[in-house]
Amino acid sequence: MAKHNEKELADTSKFLSFVLRHKPEAIGIVLDREGWADIDKLILCAQKAGKRLTRALLDTVVATSDKKRFSYSSDGRCIRAVQGHSTSQVAISFAEKTPPQFLYHGTASRFLDEIKKQGLIAGDRHYVHLSADEATARKVGARHGSPVVLTVKAQEMAKRGIPFWQAENGVWLTSTVAVEFLEW
């Protein structure tokens, strides 16, 4: 694996998140419905847009991402963001899965008043993202300010017919979480 510095890896991960989750058109690529982008085209379009991108750099980002944000297709010719999409081009078909009794959502304290009114909503994303453990949820919440971890009564939701999915990186997904299923 080629050597790359931490800043280069972080910048590349942010760039990939932007184009593979939100704005593929920013560099002229098209994602299929499952979110896959042809790697050769991605590299070419990124370079035309002034972003240094190589297969070796992609390999390092995919292999070392602590959150496993990206994955390669089985033939190694395509890459995608595992979850977190806001672009309407993508509708990944996750298999429905029964959740554990509780899941966790990390947020910033400044969002609590709104959450207490409307619950958790996907916003610009396709799904509400939930963590299997409190520590991960706390890290997520800390990205946005003073972290707060909410407990989601996931099994109770599932028993009421609300579906859950789990992305290949372990992130749990659901469409919304009503206030009644949250513990503060």
Curated annotation (Swiss-Prot):
Fetch the InterPro entries from UniProt.
Answer: Ptrans_KptA/Tpt1, RNA_2'-PTrans_C, RNA_2'-PTrans_KptA, RNA_2'-PTrans_N
Function (record text): Removes the 2'-phosphate from RNA via an intermediate in which the phosphate is ADP-ribosylated by NAD followed by a presumed transesterification to release the RNA and generate ADP-ribose 1''-2''-cyclic phosphate (APPR>P). May function as an ADP-ribosylase.
Q: Which SUPFAM superfamilies match?
A: ADP-ribosylation
E.C. numbers: 2.7.1.-
Q: Does the keyword Transferase apply?
A: yes
Q: What is this protein called?
A: Probable RNA 2'-phosphotransferase
| EC class name | transferase
| Chain's gene name | kptA
GO biological process assignments? tRNA splicing, via endonucleolytic cleavage and ligation
Which family, according to UniProt?
Answer: Belongs to the KptA/TPT1 family.
Sorted alphabetically, the keyword list is: NAD, Transferase
- What molecular functions are annotated in GO for this chain? NAD+ poly-ADP-ribosyltransferase activity; tRNA 2'-phosphotransferase activity
Looking up HAMAP family in the UniProt record yields: KptA
Q: Which organism is it from?
A: Shigella boydii serotype 18 (strain CDC 3083-94 / BS512)
* UniProt cross-references to Gene3D superfamilies, sorted A to Z: 3.20.170.30, RNA 2'-phosphotransferase, Tpt1/KptA family, N-terminal domain
